[in-house]
Structure formats: C-alpha cells, structure tokens
C-alpha cells in the first residue's frame, strides 16, 4: 500500500520519503497496431484507477508519486526508440501523468530485448535513452500544470558501456 509512506515522519513534521515510485508499468510493443505503448498490470492499474484514494493523499503531504516504466522482454525498450518513437511514447507517458495526477515517470530498462525495426525503433544507445527522458520531460511540462520529475534507475542493455550519465546536471554511475 503506497499510503504506508505517509506514516514515516521526521521530527520536524516533514515526510521522510521524497517520492513513491509505483513499480511498474511496462513499455510494450503491440505488433497488431504497430505501436509502442504503456501496459499496466492489474495491480498497477488498480493504483492508477484509485488515484484519488491511494495516490493523491501522498501528494497532499508533499510526497511525489512517480510511475516506473520497465522493459517487458520484447523489442520496445527505454534505450531503443527512434527520435520519433521517443516523442510519441513521451507524450503517452505525459498524458498518463495528467490523467492520474502523477508527478513523473521513472525508467528501468532491465528486461528489454532490443530487436525491433521500423519507425518506432533505433539501435539501443545512451543517446536514445537520454532522448526518451528529454521527450518525456518536455511533454510533461507542456501537459501537466505542476512540477514533474524524470527518474532513471537502470539502463540495462547499454549500462555496461556507459562511464556515467548526467541527468539534470547530476552524474550517475
């Protein structure tokens, strides 16, 4: 239950946790529609569908609520979308943030396979991962009338080739 985070309070009355990350929606490929999309399992969808009761109390206490996006063993992956694919998927994620009043998106690319071709896909690279972060942040800024975050956990397939990644001026190794 994400509401458990409210129970951890510092001596000054502030919440102990800065953010709760809902784990996880999936980046998936729909072969019949030829489209990358976010798929929520029943547990995540239940949290989203009950946002007013389960997520908004966190936000009212100053705790950010993010939806993590995880690869799901198919060709759609955080670091493998084309520039156009990054823009399209970033817009979808921003719309989800608006619809469910979320504070942002987290990316975790542990389970993508990276074998896609076509207009949605590019070879996996740190540049394409950064592009997806950028396009998502840009779309959230355009749609959401509140501050939004992009969180990066792991870049899976390309992680070992990266000396470090800079996100909002902070180095991550």
Can you annotate each of these PLM segments?
Residues 1-173:
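Chitinase-like catalytic core of GlcNAc-active glycosidases
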């Amino acid at each position: 239950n994400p509401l458990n985070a409210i129970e951890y309070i510092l001596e000054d009355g502030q919440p102990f946790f800065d953010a709760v990350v809902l784990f996880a929606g999936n980046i998936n490929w729909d072969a019949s529609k030829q489209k990358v999309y976010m798929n929520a399992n029943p547990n995540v969808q239940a949290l989203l569908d009950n946002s007013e009761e389960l997520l908004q109390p966190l936000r009212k206490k100053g705790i950010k609520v993010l939806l993590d996006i995880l690869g799901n063993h198919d060709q759609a992956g955080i670091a493998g979308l084309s520039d156009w694919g990054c823009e399209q998927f970033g817009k979808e994620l921003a719309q989800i943030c608006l619809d469910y009043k979320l504070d942002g998106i987290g990316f975790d690319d542990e389970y993508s396979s990276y074998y896609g071709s076509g207009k949605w896909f590019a070879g996996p690279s740190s540049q394409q991962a950064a592009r997806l972060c950028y396009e998502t942040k840009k779309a959230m800024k355009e749609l959401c009338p509140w501050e939004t975050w992009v969180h990066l956990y792991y870049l899976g397939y390309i992680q070992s080739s990266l000396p470090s990644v800079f996100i909002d001026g902070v180095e991550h190794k």
